[in-house]
Structures are given as structure tokens and as C-alpha cells.
Amino acid sequence: MTKEKIVLAYSGGLDTSVAIQWLVESGYEVIACCLDVGEGKNLDFIKEKAITVGASASYTIDAKEEFAENFALIALQAHAYYEGKYPLISALSRPLIAKKLVEVARQEGASAIAHGCTGKGNDQVRFEVAIHALAPDLKVVSPVRDWKWSREEEINYAKEHNIPVPIDLDNPFSIDQNLWGRSNECGVLENPWTTPPEAAYDLTVSLEDAPDTADIVEITFDAGIPISLNGENMSLANLILTLNEIAGKHGVGRIDHIENRLVGIKSREVYECPAAVTLITAHKELEDLTFVREVAHFKPIIEQKISETIYNGLWFSPLTEALIAFLKSTQKFVNGTIRVKLFKGHAIVEGRKSPNSLYDENLATYTSSDTFDQDAAVGFIKLFGLPTKVSAEVNSKVTITTEV
């Protein structure tokens, strides 16, 4: 009898390694699938481990460029910070992982997909909603959520089935990383009063250890896309990874956040996103230079909504598609170069230039070269202030009594 095929989102860690054996015992033929989205995974090791543990096939996919160009770029152009702080690190990679899982499932003729998420996090929602959007006929299985084992029970199960137990299990933190940043939770971070220890960080240095000399970087954008760093053209993925190193050594991009999860609880998260913070800061300044006022004032409304829909796992929803369409329509003239000073945790814009700049020095100056028609201000003020004046004239005739 042919076994039912299931594609597992495989990380190489304890949870998903145990999940392979658990799914095999449940009657499935397991196909493992692992993506590198910029966290620097050893894909060859992970591919071999999946087979050793019990998978019948193992896919490893270098998805850094696709992640950068189709997912991180949207977050950059949307200046996406969930609740004004979280730059959607993990939330951005989940729809891409789900997309690849569905592609492998179709290729293998699988009828189900499995993930290693717990029952109290956001990722279970992101994976399952994305999979249902892309392949509503596929069943989704969540071993970790179903078995409800403690960490000790999981380790014992692994030992009983000769599953290699990772040597870093004593690490108190739960970490997720991609090229857009690094997320950290659990351990001492669960107490919101506790200062995050330096051991919680990897991409950035503390302000105390940051250099006393700044780095100056120039980032060039073409239609809202970063295309070069300090005059050197590079792919978006490489530009982000390079900027992570440069900005990270100055302590840029540390975020400590009490976050409202989709599942209804608050969690304390520590993030590192040096490139994301630097790029969003630079991109925002270039938009300020090239946007007309009405677009500049309206776009933040769209930015907030995009941040929420992505965080909530609705990447493939009609709403997100429409929001992204608006976003892309605004980027045509976002061309130019931004000069940023990286120093002691700050990304400070010190210069900007653009062939599409709407800044006219002759209109803005107060020198003799001023070309602004100040006489036009009289009529403008009269018309602009007319509703306020009429309201005051009408309502001043009404006696207002205020009771104390």
C-alpha cells in the first residue's frame, strides 16, 4: 500500500527532526524541505540529516535572492514596522517558505504539508493561511502542536529513536533569523523588566562597544530599489547582508518590543535588524525628497495596513495584493542617493540627492535668488482660511453658556 506523502518544513533542529520520525510512525512518507533565506544554514548538512532521520527525500533551496527581491523589498518600500517597532523579520519569510512547500508538494504528488510551529505562536497562522491560499486542497499537519510534549519528553523521544540531539539545546533563547534581521525570545527575555543580556545579540554590538568613529555609507536607489552601496552595484540580497555587517558593528537596529501577537497574548521580543533600519531610514528620506505632499501624507496609512496584514499572515490575501499594488505605483520616481552616518546605534541621514527631487532651492531660499511669488500668499491665505473665518463669524453670534 502506497503511503501518503507529506512535505515537512524542515529546519534541522530538534522539533522538526523529531517530527520526521513522528510522521513516519503516523504512516506518512516524509519529504523534507529547507530554505536558506539568509541565516547562513549549512544546507548540505541539513539535507543529509533529514535523510538520516527518516525522510525519503530532502529538498534544500537557496532562496536568499527571491526573499530579498519579492518579500524584504516590499517591507522596505512599505517602511513596515508592526506596531511601529517590529520590521516583520519572521513574518516576511513564512509566505515564501509556504510557497516553496506547496511547489515541492505539487512536484512530489504530496497530499499534505507539515510545519513545526507550536500552538501559541503567530507562525502556525502564517503558514497555514498561506498554504490554504495557495493550495486549498492540501491538508496541513502540525506535529508539535498536536503532541504537546515538554522539551524533556521531546529529547527522550529523540534519544529512543537515535535522532541526533543538537548540541545547543541548553541555549535559553528561541531564535529565528533571515537576511532582514534576527528575532529572539524566551529565557530571561520573558521577564519584561530584565535587561537583555549581550548573549541575546549576534548581529549587533552594544553602544558601549561600538566604534568611536562613524562609518558613512551612500545608498543608491532606482525606482525605490537599493541597487548600490558606496558606489558598488550588487544584488539586493548581498547589499542587505553587507549592510548588516557595516551597520551592525555600530549597534544600529536593536529593538526591544512588547508585542501584541495575533493569537491574543503579549510577548517580549528582542530584534536585531541593522540593514533593515538603515535602508528604511534612507528610503523614507528619498521619498520625502521625491513625493508630492498628498502621496507623502497618505502613504503612511497604507504602510500601517500592509504591516498588519503581513504580520497577521495575510500575504496572499486580496487586500495585501491591492495594498502592494498601490505601494509599487508610488516608487517610479524614488531615484537617487542617500548618505547615511552610522554611529553609536543611530542611522543618521546627512545628505540626499535625486534627479526627481521636488526640492527647489530657488523657491526655498531666503536669499536674493528667491523666485517664490510672495504676493500670491495673500489670496491663498484668504481662500484657505475662508471656512474657518465663516465658522467664526456664524458661531460668534451664538451665546455659549458653560456650566461649571
Swiss-Prot record:
It holds the Pfam family Arginosuc_syn_C. NCBIfam families: argG, PRK00509.1. Its EC number is 6.3.4.5. Homotetramer. L-citrulline binds at residues 86, 122, 126, 174, 183, 259, 271. It is an enzyme of class 6 (ligase). One of its GO terms (molecular function) is argininosuccinate synthase activity. GO terms for cellular component: cytoplasm. Its main location: cytoplasm. GO terms for biological process: argininosuccinate metabolic process; L-arginine biosynthetic process; urea cycle. It is found in: Cytoplasm. Pathway: Amino-acid biosynthesis; L-arginine biosynthesis; L-arginine from L-ornithine and carbamoyl phosphate: step 2/3. This is Argininosuccinate synthase. L-aspartate binds at residues 118, 122-123. It comes from Listeria innocua serovar 6a (strain ATCC BAA-680 / CLIP 11262). Belongs to the argininosuccinate synthase family. Type 1 subfamily. CDD domains: ASS. It catalyses: L-citrulline + L-aspartate + ATP = 2-(N(omega)-L-arginino)succinate + AMP + diphosphate + H(+). Keywords: Amino-acid biosynthesis, Arginine biosynthesis, ATP-binding, Cytoplasm, Ligase, Nucleotide-binding. ATP binds at residues 9-17, 116. InterPro entries: Arginosuc_syn_C (IPR048268), Arginosuc_syn_N (IPR048267), Arginosuc_synth (IPR001518), Arginosuc_synth_CS (IPR018223), Arginosuc_synth_type_1_subfam (IPR023434), AS_cat/multimer_dom_body (IPR024074), Rossmann-like_a/b/a_fold (IPR014729).
